């Protein structure tokens, strides 16, 4: 039996185990941003150790001052290359009314694995682990390490503290991150850049309580209207142009070569709109859409709270309100600098508005050339029959920049999720096709690294 036949057989034989472990992981509501889920976060860490140990790896919980990091893997020898695979096991909240099932009640519907965290990022984490187990069974000359974070969804505030414990989390020769989304089913995508992120809340209180609008309206200040006025002054809702003075000063536009690469990726505007349920978007030009979602900064409004939200209309002037916003940044922009510009501008617009930061992540830009990239190309083709497209990722992963600063090693991406899987959305799912292809791709990637040797 050839190695390829052995791998195919291995994947089929391991399917039930994969599904069982994914179900157990999904059913733990590991919502890092919810303080009431602290005990569930600890349960998630304990299960992660159990999963790694059950696969024959050594594993440990690394305390950080916040939620821990789980580290584990296999060591063949210091003379061999070491690769670290990064995933996260914390998830987004799941309170949307559109859910068709209990979000943390795992469902396996013929190879479609439904539940919060199935694709972001528990399914891909397990697929990589199963690929690694096959590589170890082949006795490849390679050290494979896993790093599973529990604070990615809140900006990785304590991840650096975990990396600082070098005896427990050794420095690798390279890193692979499996926490990204393809352009479309059938077209693997390898990002070489990530946008940064600033989250903030803008609060304004103009009274101690809500007041009757018929009695006080016209004289009373309306905090929701004033917050909307601030929002309108920050971003053009029709074009998306950010109006904060100095916001674009450090932005470096993508090169013509990058834009050509974006267009070669197979990106289709129609498919993009269908995948995310959009009726219309700001432009239908493929080059401009890809530039906007992968290589341009943004200002987004996520919510406005205050006043009355029940049925009908309650005629009150709210006593206070809160606006939730974020800004995505591109390489060369600095979150601290942009936040200072934003805070100064808001103070000028309305000095009574308080700006409360909710985390900052730096942008990242790597390379789409070199020997490690070639390994990813061959691995993706082996797993999915097609080489990956090289794009930038519009989202943010705080741990990536932290690893780059701490280790100064190549960081590659081998994501397994699809747009329709529903990252951060109701009715999230993962599927066996992506899981099995991922196992195959990772097994090939480890073989490629072993062949390349220590560099």
Model-derived regions: residue spans:
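Acidic, glycine-rich active-site loops and adjacent beta-strand->loop/helix elements
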Residues: 89-91, 112, 147-156, 178-182, ...
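Flexible glycine/proline-rich, aromatic-decorated loop/lid segments
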Residues: 191-205, 412
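A common structural junction motif
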Residues: 89-90, 234-239, 343-352
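A short core secondary-structure module
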Residues: 217-239
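An extended, acidic, His-containing surface patch that forms the Zn2+-binding/catalytic region
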Residues: 156, 184-185, 243-320, 331-341, ...
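Acidic/histidine-rich catalytic neighborhood of metal-dependent amide-processing enzymes
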Residues: 121-193, 454
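N-terminal helical capping/dimerization or prosegment-like subdomains
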Residues: 2-96, 320, 324
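Active-site metal-coordination/substrate-binding segment of hydrolases
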Residues: 80-148, 437
């Amino acid at each position: 039996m050839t190695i390829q036949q052995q791998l195919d057989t291995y994947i089929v034989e391991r399917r039930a185990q994969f599904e069982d472990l994914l179900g157990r992981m999904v059913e733990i509501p590991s919502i890092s941003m919810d303080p009431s889920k602290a005990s569930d976060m600890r349960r998630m860490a304990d299960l992660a150790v159990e999963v790694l140990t059950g696969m024959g790896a050594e594993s440990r919980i690394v305390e950080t001052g916040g939620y821990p990091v789980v580290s584990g893997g296999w060591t063949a020898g210091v003379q061999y290359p070491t690769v670290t695979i990064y995933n996260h096991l914390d998830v987004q909240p799941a309170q949307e009314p559109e859910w068709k099932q209990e979000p943390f009640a795992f469902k396996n519907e013929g190879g479609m694995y439904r539940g919060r965290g199935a694709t972001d990022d528990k399914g891909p984490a397990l697929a990589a682990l199963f690929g690694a187990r096959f590589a170890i069974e082949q006795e490849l000359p390679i050290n494979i390490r896993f790093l599973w974070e529990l604070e990615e969804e809140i900006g990785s505030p304590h991840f650096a503290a975990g990396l600082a414990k070098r005896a427990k989390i050794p420095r690798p020769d390279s890193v692979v991150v499996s926490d990204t989304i393809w352009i479309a089913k059938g077209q693997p995508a390898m990002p070489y850049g990530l946008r940064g992120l600033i989250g903030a809340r803008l609060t304004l209180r103009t009274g101690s309580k809500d007041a009757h609008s018929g009695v006080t309206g016209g004289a009373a200040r309306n905090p929701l209207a004033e917050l909307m006025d601030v929002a309108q002054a920050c971003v053009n809702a029709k074009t998306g142009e950010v109006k904060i003075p100095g916001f674009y000063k450090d932005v470096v536009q993508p090169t013509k070569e990058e834009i050509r690469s974006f267009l070669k990726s197979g990106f289709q505007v129609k498919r993009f709109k269908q995948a995310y349920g959009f009726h219309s978007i700001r432009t239908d030009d493929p080059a401009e859409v890809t530039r906007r979602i992968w290589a341009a900064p943004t200002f987004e409004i996520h919510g406005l709270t205050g006043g009355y939200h029940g049925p009908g209309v309650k005629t009150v002037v709210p006593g206070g309100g809160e606006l939730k916003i974020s800004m995505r940044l591109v390489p060369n922009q600095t979150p601290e600098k942009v936040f200072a510009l934003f805070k100064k501008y808001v103070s000028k617009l309305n000095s009574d508005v308080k700006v409360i930061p909710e985390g900052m992540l730096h942008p990242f830009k790597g390379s789409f050339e070199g020997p490690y990239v070639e390994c990813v190309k061959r691995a993706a083709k082996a797993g999915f029959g097609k080489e990956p497209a090289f794009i930038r990722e519009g989202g943010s992963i705080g741990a990536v920049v932290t690893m780059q600063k701490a280790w100064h090693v190549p960081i590659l991406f081998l994501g397994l999720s699809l747009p329709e899987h529903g990252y951060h959305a109701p009715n999230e799912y993962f599927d066996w096709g992506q899981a099995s292809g991922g196992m195959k791709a990772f097994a090939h990637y480890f073989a490629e690294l072993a062949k390349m040797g220590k560099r």
